[in-house]
């Protein structure tokens, strides 16, 4: 989707220069199509619950971000873009954060802000501010842009994370607020 591509390009404008010294990168919960947008394709391993049929020539490992099958410090960078909010419970989010800090010598973890009026998962304004019980598959299918594009029921599996909670999950890390039109669009956690 062009809007998502615009924000990804903007977010990753300085990524390559900031992390060019990282020869091994673990992308937790990501997809291979993100990396050509960033401008990097070498030394990347993707960890996902399921491995897609089309791997795009990238190395995938099947596993959970809450229990990673790698040694401590196995990667120069543990990277995650919009995945930590999908692991379920707050307890799982803390496990995910802990595992990123364990396997990566440096980390980069981005998650969207609930305060932004457009939910990037739905590509629709304001619905994510409703009580979760209202976000039925039927509502998500017929009243969201993603529902119209995908034409299938959608299960809303997002557990939003505040900046304050991120500080607890990632002690000692920097947290930057990415803004659009002065509004907090997402939070980016970095270390190293």
What are these regions (language model features)?
Residues 13, 94, 98, 164:
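Active-site phosphate/pyrophosphate- and oxyanion-stabilizing loops and adjacent acidic/basic residues
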Residues 106-137:
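Conserved class I S-adenosyl-L-methionine
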Residues 158, 182-189:
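Short hydrophobic/aromatic beta-strand or adjacent loop that forms the aromatic wall/cage
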Residues 1-20:
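Class I SAM-dependent methyltransferase Rossmann-like catalytic core
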Residues 151-173:
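Short alpha-helix
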Residues 172-183:
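Conserved S-adenosyl-L-methionine
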Residues 19, 23-117, 190-191:
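Conserved SAM-binding loop
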Residues 122-125, 140-154:
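Short, glycine-/aromatic-enriched active-site segment of Class I SAM-dependent methyltransferases
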């Amino acid at each position: 989707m062009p809007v998502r591509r615009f924000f990804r390009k903007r977010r990753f404008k300085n990524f390559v220069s900031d992390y060019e010294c990282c020869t091994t990168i673990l992308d937790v919960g990501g997809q291979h199509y993100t990396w050509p947008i960033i401008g990097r394709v070498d030394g990347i391993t993707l960890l996902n619950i399921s491995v897609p049929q089309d791997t795009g020539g990238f190395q995938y490992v099947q596993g959970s971000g809450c229990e990673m099958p790698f040694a401590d410090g196995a990667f120069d960078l543990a990277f995650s873009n919009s995945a930590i909010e999908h692991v379920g419970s707050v307890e799982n989010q803390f496990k995910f954060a802990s595992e990123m800090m364990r396997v990566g010598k440096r980390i980069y973890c981005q998650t969207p802000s609930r305060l932004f009026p457009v939910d990037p998962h739905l590509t629709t304004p304001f619905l994510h501010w409703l009580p979760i019980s209202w976000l039925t598959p039927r509502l998500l299918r017929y009243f969201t842009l993603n529902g119209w594009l995908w034409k299938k029921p959608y299960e809303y599996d997002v557990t939003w994370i505040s900046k304050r909670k991120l500080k607890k999950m990632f002690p000692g890390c920097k947290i930057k607020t990415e803004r659009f039109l002065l509004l907090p669009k997402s939070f980016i956690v970095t270390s190293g």
